[in-house]
Amino acid sequence: MLSQQMQNLGLPPITIGIGIATGFANVGHMGSRYHMTYTAVGDPVNTANRLQRCTGYYDLSLVVSESTVEKVPEFLFRELDTVHVKGRQRFVRLFEPVCPVEEASPDLHKRLQLHGKAMQFYRQGMWSDAERLFAKLSRDDLSNHEFYMKYVDRIQKIRTTRPEDESAHILDLTQQIGSL
């Protein structure tokens, strides 16, 4: 609502990015008797921070981890990527919440199924098949055209620079986006 009011005044909208990762963390008052603070620490806290920084790259307001997707079966998610972020040895699969399952139209289910197939081809290094599907999605789903064109561009770069690299599908964000 505030963002809309600002736009009505000709000001830029307020945009925020939220990253959500699910897992165990230590939360509470920590420190010494001279300096106490209420904080949260743990792997999911750090991962959520990295995911929050990814929101700008994908032009989204919310990015969640695979651990979160597993805990919310009543929601549909669109897989965004597999990334390597600073501070993590394991790769992180990123997702975007789409809508509650019961609210999804047959057309949306069909597009998400096609998207899932494109992501599967991409992860398997089947570049031609993945590029074909991402190009189709970019034409058919204009609201996500830029997102899908990122994949088409990445595939073209992979083909010319490292076509045999088994980890080429993993986006290395350890040195990008404000030192993720």
Question: Where does each model-flagged region fall?
Answer:
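Compositionally biased amphipathic helical and low-complexity segments enriched in hydrophobic
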Residues: S3, D81, D172-T174
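Cytosolic regulatory/linker segments at or just downstream of nucleotide-handling modules
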Residues: A25-V27, C54-D129, A135-S167
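Weak global preference for isoleucine
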Residues: I14-I20, I155-I158, I170, I177
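Intrinsically disordered, low-complexity, charge-biased linker/tail regions
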Residues: E164-L180
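Structural preference for long, well-ordered alpha-helical segments in enzyme cores
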Residues: T47-A48
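Catalytic core of nucleotidyl cyclases, primarily class III adenylyl/guanylyl cyclases
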Residues: L2-D43, S67-V72, R88-C99
